[in-house]
Amino acid sequence: MKVGILDSTLREGEQTPGVVFTIDQRVEIAKALSDVGVQMIEAGHPAVSSDIYEGIKRIMKLKREGLITSEIVGHSRAVKKDIEVAAELEVDRIAIFYGVSDIHLKAKHHVTREEALNIIAETISYAKSHGVKVRFTAEDGSRTDLDYLIKVCKTARDAGADRVSIADTVGILYPTKTRELFSTLVREVPGLEFDIHAHNDLGLAVANALAAIEGGATIIHTTVNGLGERVGIVPLQVIAAAIKYHFGIEVVKLNKLQQLASLVEKYSGIPMPPNYPITGDYAFIHKAGIHVAGVLNDPSTYEFMPPETFGRSRDYVIDKYTGKHALKDRFEKLGVKLSDVELDQVLAKIKSNPNVRFYRDVDLLEIAESVTGRVLKPKPPENIEALISVKCESNVYTTAVTRRLSVIPGVKEVMEISGDYDILVKVEAKDPNELNQIIENIRAVKGVSSTLTSLVLKKM
C-alpha cells in the first residue's frame, strides 16, 4: 500500500472565511509542513494575488536551497494565463482544476461535455509544454456521471497528467461509495494515480479518505486543523493518526503535529476546539474515575495510541468524578503521602463541592492540609522544561546563531520565529541550577543580545 499527503493549508486553508496569511507566514507554514514530512505542498493559486505569487516565489527559493524538500504545487484554473503565471514560478507541479459535473458544466462553465473534454486536454497539454508535472482536479467529481468521469480521467492522462484528484466538492460521499468509486477508477484508467480531495460537509471527510486509500488512492489532500471552504477538508493531524493506526504507515512525523497545529492556529486566527482529535487540549485528558483507574494500570484501556507518539502527555481531571486511585496518584506525583483515611477525607471534601469544574494541585494541597492539620511540602519537579525566546543583534545572521544554540547541552529544539524575538529555544534541565547554566550558555553565544525565559507548567 502506497499513500502520501498533499497539504493544502496555503491554498484551501486560506479559503476559510476570515483567514489571510501574510507572505512571511506562508513561508513559515511551508517550512513547517516540509519539516513534518508532507509529500506535497499546495502553495496557492498564484494568479489570484501578488502576495500569493510572492509567497510561492520565496517558497521555491527555499526549495532550490534544499530548505524545503516537499514537492511544491501551484494551483491553476483551466486557463492559459493562469498556467503561465504558475509556470514562471518554476513550481514542481501545476494543478489544473475544472468542474466536470453536469451542474458545473451548465451553470458555471456553460459548455457541453465534449467541449469540456477539449478544454481539459488543451490546458493540460499546454502546462506540460512548460516542462512541469501536471495534476488534473475533477472538481465536483463525486457528483459526476461515472462513465463521463472515466472519460475525463482518460482525457487528462492522455494529455499528460500523471495524477487526477477526485474532489468531493460538497462533501456528500460516504465510505462505501468512495471505496467503490476509487476502485473503479483505478481499474478503468491504468497509468494514472489518484488523489482524494474530501470536503467535510457531512463530517465524513476522514472516513472517506480512509476508504479512498482502500480503493487505491495514493495521495490524500489535507489542511492543518481541517481549514477550508465552509467546514473545511480532511485535517492533517487526524488522517495521519488514522493511517498510522489502521494501516501502520507513518505518512508524516507524528510527534511534530502539535507544534504545526499550534502554528496554523496562531496564524489563521481560528482556535482549535479543546476536544479536537489528536491536537486538542483534551485529546489525552481523562476524567471519569473508572477511566483514570484503568489508564493508571494500563493506558491502552482508554487510549488508542500513547500520547507521546504525538509529542503529547496524558493527564486527568480532579473533580467530583474522581476516584481514590487518581487522587492517590496525584498526591504521590506531588511527593505528598496521605493515609487511606486521609485520602477518603480529601475525596469527601471534593465530592461535597460538585460544582467545582476542576481542582488544581494547589487546591488539593489546601484541602489536604485542612484535613490533616499538617503543612505539606510538595517536592520540586524532577525535570524542568523551559522555552527561551532569544533576540539577536541586528548585524548577525539569525541562522548562524540558531546553529550555535542547537549544540548547547540541554537544548532540545531550536526554531527561528517571527515577532519581537528571533529564535525560540526549548530546553530541559534536571534542576533550577542546571537551567540557569543553560540560560547563561545561551546568553554567551555570539550574536545573542537578550533572552526571555518561560517555564513550561503543563503540557496537554
From Swiss-Prot:
Checking Pfam families in the record gives:
AsnC_trans_reg (PF01037), HCS_D2 (PF22617), HMGL-like (PF00682)
Residues reported to bind 2-oxoglutarate? R11, H75, R135, T169
Q: What Enzyme Commission number(s) appear in the record?
A: 2.3.3.14
This protein's cofactor list reads: Mg(2+); Mn(2+)
Which GO terms of the molecular function aspect are on file?
2-isopropylmalate synthase activity; homocitrate synthase activity; metal ion binding
Q: Which residues does the entry assign to the active site, renumbered to this chain? A: H291
Say yes or no: keyword Hydrolase present. Answer: no
Record field: catalytic activity: acetyl-CoA + 2-oxoglutarate + H2O = (2R)-homocitrate + CoA + H(+)
Q: What is known of its domains?
A: Contains an N-terminal catalytic domain fused with a RAM (Regulation of Amino acid Metabolism) domain at the C-terminus. The mutant enzyme lacking the RAM domain is insensitive to inhibition by lysine, indicating that the RAM domain is responsible for enzyme allosteric regulation. Moreover, the mutant enzyme lacking the RAM domain forms homodimer irrespective of the presence of lysine, which suggests that HCS undergoes changes in its oligomeric state by binding lysine at its RAM domain.
Q: How does it assemble?
A: Forms a homotetramer in the absence of lysine, and is in hexadecamer-octamer equilibrium in the presence of lysine.
Q: What is this protein called?
A: Homocitrate synthase
Q: Which organism is it from?
A: Sulfurisphaera tokodaii (strain DSM 16993 / JCM 10545 / NBRC 100140 / 7) (Sulfolobus tokodaii)
- What lineage is on file? Archaea, Thermoproteota, Thermoprotei, Sulfolobales, Sulfolobaceae
